[in-house]
Amino acid sequence: MTAPTWIEAVVREFGKAAGLSGLALNDRGAAAISFENGAALRLEYAFDSLVAALTLPARLDPATAARLLAYAHPEARYGFKLRAGYLSKGGRAVFAARLADREVTLPALNSVFSVLWRIGQEFGGAS
């Protein structure tokens, strides 16, 4: 799905601020960045929302599952709803946030990324 021009501009500005001048949504409304530590950030525009998802290498065991659930608990306060899960194919934890198109601003995207990255550090993958 093609994103509105102004959302594409926010993503480009986010990339420039992060030193990734080539970051832009493709014709499907998606962009991805892989980091040296194995973490990956994916941005995707669909259904009038921009989703930011950070994935990290992880093994699934009861302790990991409990930690994933704790991060996504309704009482956790991040300023947005956080979803957490596990991708068995590839063995990756995933943390995601959805911003409605009217909420997509450079400060909001920076805030979401900062929280996702901090959670990744706490979880043990992003550094």
Each language-model region and where it sits:
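Charge-rich, low-complexity N-terminal segments
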Residues: 1-40, 77-87
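Well-ordered alpha/beta subsegment
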Residues: 81-114, 118-127
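Short, internal acidic amphipathic alpha-helical interface segments
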Residues: 51-90
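Hydrophobic residues embedded in beta-strands of well-ordered beta-sheets
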Residues: 30-31, 50, 91-93
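Short, well-structured hydrophobic secondary-structure segments
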Residues: 33-36, 41-54
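Short beta-strand-to-loop capping motifs
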Residues: 35, 54-56, 97-101
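Generic alpha-helical secondary structure
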Residues: 4-7, 61-65, 109
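Short, Φ-rich (hydrophobic/aromatic) sequence segments
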Residues: 14, 64-72, 110-116
